[in-house]
Amino acid sequence: MPCLRRTILVLILAPTLVWPPLAATAEEAPPPLYDETLLLVDLVRDAADLVAAEGLDAACAEFRQPGSHWFQDEIYVFVFDLEGSAVCHPALPALEGQELLELRDPLGKPIIQSFLREVESGSESGWVHYLWPKPGSSTFRWKTAHVRRTTAPNGTDYIVGSGLYEMEMERFFVVEQVDDAVDLLTTAGVEEAFYTLRDPATGFRFYDAYVFVLDGDGLMLVNVGFPDLEGRNLAALQDESGKLFVQEMLAVEQGESAWIDYLWPKPGETRPSRKSSYVRRIEIDGRDYVVGAGVYFR
């Protein structure tokens, strides 16, 4: 276990963000594909069960043991209360006792607020993607945390979580991303939603995944990963193999969803990679929109 060195945390005060309600999916989200995802879910569930069975103090005493099931290298269990205070953080014990509702990553994403949002909207667990340094490092990397709400024997509720750095992208991550974007468009209004989608603090881009919005004729309205494409009609666009993938997206029926496979570069790159995008077609005020996001194959 490397020694814990000084870690730089970024605290940013930003305007209130417009958060969509947690989405009701157009199709059932695909199950986790990778073993590391399943193991993380099991770890967090077991940790939450331990808090529920033995109480916070006893559970945290176990979570803090280096080399244990709960704390191995860069993987550790953390616990927050519902007021946003860290009550157990083995990797950064200096955070314990601090109210961290305004803790934000370098993109401005409110990390603890995002944890709370996942477990306060009728779901006992959820996923949050953000930038965070590994233990002993000051370099921020993409991290995906799985969080779960649990109740200790004394009746106090807590958020228990753990995360992985630069984990494999699951298809259900982008299904949730697209569904959140659709709910935002239908509840906040198109113009306000476009502003929120482009805001890096709101999480509509993480890792290589990003949201895009086309109108029913193929005009690119929002593209978080490739903003230079906005304002262009891409209906006739082909990938490197000659596939008219935008036409396939536009062919999705109103109210339906589909997965479209094609070749497309990752953000910041020019060489095409294999990509599969999940798209939904919706109608708002008489205008059709195709909302999508995708995963790149490794």
Where are the predicted features?
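N-terminal secretory signal peptides that target proteins for export/translocation
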Residues: M1-L4
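N-terminal membrane-sensor/transducer module of prokaryotic signaling receptors
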Residues: A24-R298
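Bacterial N-terminal signal peptides
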Residues: I8-P20
